[in-house]
Amino acid sequence: DMREFINTLHSKGIYVIGRITVFQDPYYTKIHPELAVKKMSDKTIVWKDHKGLSFIDVGAKPYWDYVVTLGKESYSIGFDELNFDYIRFPSDGDMKDIYFSWSINKSKPESLEDFFKYLHDGLAPTGATLSADLFGMTTTNKDDLNIGQVLERTLPYFDYVAPMVYPSHFPNGFNGWANPNDHIYDLIHFTMGKAVQRTISATTSEASLTFE
């Protein structure tokens, strides 16, 4: 019983985070293929990445209600925080044969931010603490990495943002490092430092900063 398990964790002073994977959802695409990302070459076929996993189209608003409902139900059983992962467009697969039937009138960042706002507003009455997982390179890239994620467009809608700065996910040559895996501390320090700088710039004005 999940509620009982969470109560046990709370009794031991453990802060419990519930992780919800969002747009990568092979189960839901089987039930509602009309909401899924499709193949450009045959728009009746659900697109899959190199691992055989399918995605819901970010712009599929009927799915947004499902995610909000899932968040409400999860929070009601006692989670201290709701963490949303795979809040992005797909990235690994045949990107030349991909079609987003629900997201054709807006850019990827715009579509994703619309979802963020809908999620935030839908869960606001619960008082739930919300967090978002982002690609690590959102800390340094100003573009959307072709997945819709832009750090500044995430900040207004979540209490915490967690860039996944795994050194293994950065390309060779990043920041001058031939192999980022050989510079674990330096990479994390550099990328998270950039994230802090951008967060301060996006959420505060110089006049509002005080130093003690």
Give, region by region, the residue ranges found by the protein language model.
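Membrane-embedded segments
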Residues: 1-6, 12, 16
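Active-site-adjacent "subsite" loops/lids of carbohydrate-active enzymes
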Residues: 2-7, 23-76
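Active-site-proximal loop/short-helix segments
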Residues: 26, 32-34, 81-109
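Glycoside hydrolase catalytic-domain groove-lining segments
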Residues: 102-134, 138-212
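Conserved, mostly hydrophobic/aromatic
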Residues: 9, 16, 67, 74, ...
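Active-site-proximal loop/turn and secondary-structure-junction residues that shape catalytic pockets
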Residues: 22-24, 86-90, 134-138, 167
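A structural motif
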Residues: 79-80, 158
